[in-house]
Design a protein with these regions (language model features):
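Peripheral, non-AAA+ core regions of ATP-driven protein-machinery
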Residues: 1-218, 222-228, 266, 331, ...
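Walker B catalytic acidic pair
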Residues: 300, 306-307, 318
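The Walker A (P-loop) glycine that initiates the GxxxxGKT/S ATP-binding motif of P-loop NTPases
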Residues: 221, 285, 307
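Walker A/P-loop
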Residues: 219-260, 325
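P-loop NTPase nucleotide-binding/switch module
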Residues: 170-209, 213, 240-295
């Protein structure tokens, strides 16, 4: 008897429906075709043990399983449940009449229990798009799938529940959540606040400008000056995630298996801080079966690279293209996948190998060591970082000050006003904030008077800045003007923007 069951495969951050055809006929053997990986090929052992432990067994006949489309690689153990149900239906142990209404996914344990799977949100979205009535999943994944409206989501703990459901002997409980309520309740929850930062007013201002325009920023300062403390508080001043951004972000983390059990929707911007020993594949994504890297996990949020020169230069260089294009393409011989990577880069570094230049009384870093240290960061990479700011060590008087600094909410309100101005400006364009401006937008929205032009010309000549750095100055100046609610860029805005570029040559060529 031939039976069709439906599952789903992940491709990038999207899903594709898989038709699992199971035929049980006279003969012996277990044949699995349709480009499955080793984990799927091993499923026969898990399925056999699981069925035996819930009172069923594999039929003593020839079992042929085809996973279509045959040219799409299928991977992982998430097809265990759908294959097992198909085998039982083809053996007349399950009524097959309603199988075509559901996507069925789940990894089987040997006792018949179900383990959580990855990529549930894109699977649920695809199921709704293709008109399926519902989706049957491990119970740990149901909160995530229930984000999708107009789709019945059933969570099960073992395969026996699924067998009884299709035989009409049990009703499964639907999982329902109020997505909007869930989103609004957690949208302003942050573990860190800028009011906890003592001193560092200049650095705080630079962080505000960076957040307002979506600019990348690098903090240069000695150990203990508060670089990491400042970076961890950036998400608290960024605009709240929109529902569209929350769904995008959740899909990426779902595909990567980074969603916790019983987690539904990511409601705050991600903050990713990989160690400096990370490989280029782990950073940008890839592998034999491509997975999102850290830059995609930071999509719509912050990627913090602490001690930037300690990262391998090759690792940093592969980040150049995603920084510019805000997406990363991973190509293989037979396919390619795109992962979004629109993130705000926050990097930090010491000014020298010793960490204390130019205030090191013993001058423990030689000129050669300094040059080698700075050469780890290429000019093209630095040009893609809009704001370079020096973070000074905090004096005792500032640390002892009991009065709290400005809160994240106050800073965020100014950032939101600037973002609203940008949203109106770019409402007819495919960009959202100033950092995304291209040459045409810069020419149109960053018009300078003669005083501003002379000011920036002098800075370019004195600091030997590149054409890309010139564009960065204009973008940052536009953001500063937006924070001031000014229609035109003034010399004061240009001066402040230049101040955020001056470190790149003073320090890099120390």
């Amino acid at each position: 008897m031939l039976v069709k069951v439906f599952g789903s495969a992940i491709h990038g951050v999207s899903a594709q429906t898989i038709t699992i055809e199971v035929n049980v006929d006279q003969g012996v053997g277990y044949h699995l075709v349709g480009l499955p990986d080793n984990a799927i090929k091993e499923s026969s052992h898990r399925i056999s043990a699981a069925l035996k432990n819930v009172g069923h067994k594999l039929p003593g006949k020839k079992i042929t399983i085809n996973m279509a489309p045959a040219d799409l690689r299928k991977e992982g153990s998430a097809y265990d449940l759908s294959i097992a149900i198909g085998i039982l239906a083809a053996s007349d142990k399950i009524l097959a009449e309603n199988l075509d209404q559901y996507i069925i996914m789940g990894e089987l344990s040997l006792d018949g229990g179900l383990q959580p799977i990855k990529g549930v949100l894109p699977i649920a979205i695809k199921a709704r798009e293709e008109g399926f009535k519902g989706i049957i999943l491990p119970k740990q994944n149901t909160q995530e799938a229930a984000i999708v409206n107009n789709l019945d989501v059933y969570g099960v703990e073992n395969i026996k529940e699924v067998i009884d459901f299709f035989n009409g002997e049990r009703d499964l409980e639907k999982t329902e959540i109020d997505t909007r309520k869930e989103f609004q309740n957690k949208i302003n929850e942050f573990p860190y606040d800028f009011s906890e930062v003592k001193g560092q007013e200049t650095a705080k201002r630079a962080m505000e400008v960076a957040a307002a325009g979506g600019h990348n920023i690098i903090l240069v300062g000695p150990p203990g000056s508060g670089k990491t403390m400042l970076a961890k508080r950036v998400p608290s001043i960024l605009p709240p995630l929109t529902m569209k951004e929350a769904l995008e972000t959740t899909k990426i983390h779902s595909v990567a298996g980074k969603m916790g059990s019983n987690t539904s929707l990511m409601t705050v911007r991600p903050f990713r801080s990989p160690h400096h020993t990370i490989s280029d594949v782990a950073l940008v994504g890839g592998g034999a079966y491509p997975q999102p890297g850290e830059i995609s996990l930071a999509h719509n949020g912050v990627l913090f690279l602490d001690e930037l020169p300690e990262f391998k230069r090759a690792v940093l260089e592969v980040m150049r293209q995603p920084l510019e294009d805000r997406e990363v393409t991973i190509s293989r011989a037979k396919f390619s996948v795109n992962y979004p990577s629109s993130f705000m880069l926050v990097a930090s570094m010491n000014p020298s190998p010793s960490g204390y230049f130019p205030d090191d009384p013993n001058n423990t870093s030689s000129q050669t060591e300094m040059q080698r240290y700075m050469n780890k960061l290429s000019g093209p990479l630095l040009d893609r970082i809009d704001i370079h700011i020096e973070v000074q060590k905090v004096e005792f008087e500032q640390l002892a000050e009991k009065r709290k600094g400005e809160s994240s909410i106050e800073i965020r309100n100014r950032v939101l006003k600037a973002r609203e101005i940008q949203a109106k400006r770019y409402k007819d364009l495919d960009i959202n904030y100033n950092a995304q401006m291209g040459p045409k937008e810069i020419e149109k929205y960053c018009d300078l008077d003669s005083t501003c032009q002379q000011l920036i010309k002098n800075a370019m000549e004195k600091l030997n800045l590149s054409a890309r750095a010139y564009d960065r100055i204009l973008k940052v100046a536009r953001t500063i003007a937006d924070l001031d609610d000014a229609e035109n860029i003034s010399p004061a805005h240009i001066s402040e923007a230049i101040q955020y570029r001056s470190l790149d040559r003073d320090f890099w060529r120390a």
